[in-house]
């Protein structure tokens, strides 16, 4: 079993640890204990790392195309390594979920998320596994753009860091069991 795990976000220090970058944050958390480092790969327009977990080859990528063109990196990577959508898991933020909630899905629409829209457009299907991390909706009169590109307040930051630990455990559980549905049942919520 070879897997491609994609975290969505925007490249650059300006966007580091913003709400829209929880996909990048999740990958950083997952690979940290593996003693591997992401490196820039211009061919795929992504930061990439490959490693073996439980004897299986696992690729992690963070597209550097900016969110709205994430699908370009995903399509190129899948094609180059002859992987299928069944090998793909995408981790990203979700405005419609409470901060810190996790939802595993096996397919579905983009739900207004431009990174997911781009992936669906580029790979030609919405039938791929995903892990959504709730970031909540803006309060008051803040625009959605300013909200998702903003950092978490202190309370939500603690919640998100705990959530990232849960995502790390869930991904590792999945890589051991090779059963996304079982992982969904155990970790959704």
Curated annotation (Swiss-Prot):
One of its GO terms (molecular function) is peptidyl-tRNA hydrolase activity. The keyword Cell wall biogenesis/degradation does not apply. Its EC number is 3.1.1.29. One of its GO terms (biological process) is protein quality control for misfolded or incompletely synthesized proteins. Coiled coil: none annotated. Pfam families: Pept_tRNA_hydro. It comes from the Bacteria. The active site is at 20 (proton acceptor). It is found in: Cytoplasm. Hydrolyzes ribosome-free peptidyl-tRNAs (with 1 or more amino acids incorporated), which drop off the ribosome during protein synthesis, or as a result of ribosome stalling. PANTHER family: PEPTIDYL-TRNA HYDROLASE. This is Peptidyl-tRNA hydrolase.
């Amino acid at each position: 079993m070879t897997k491609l795990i994609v975290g969505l976000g925007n490249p650059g220090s300006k966007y580091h640890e913003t709400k829209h970058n929880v996909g990048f944050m999740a990958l950083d958390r997952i690979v940290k204990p593996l003693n591997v480092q992401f490196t820039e790969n211009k061919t795929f327009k992504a930061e990439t790392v490959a490693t073996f977990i439980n004897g299986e080859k696992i690729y992690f990528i963070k597209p550097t195309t900016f969110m709205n063109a994430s699908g370009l990196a995903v399509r190129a990577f899948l094609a180059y390594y002859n992987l299928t959508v069944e090998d793909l898991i995408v981790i990203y933020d979700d405005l419609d979920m409470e901060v810190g909630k996790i939802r595993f899905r096996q397919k579905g629409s983009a739900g207004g998320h431009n990174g997911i829209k781009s992936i669906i457009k580029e790979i030609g299907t919405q039938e791929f596994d995903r892990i959504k991390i709730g970031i909540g909706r803006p309060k008051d009169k803040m625009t959605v753009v300013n909200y998702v590109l903003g950092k978490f307040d202190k309370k939500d930051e603690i919640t998100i860091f705990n959530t990232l630990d849960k995502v790390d455990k869930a991904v590792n559980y999945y890589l051991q069991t090779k059963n996304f549905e079982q992982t969904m049942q155990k970790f959704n919520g």
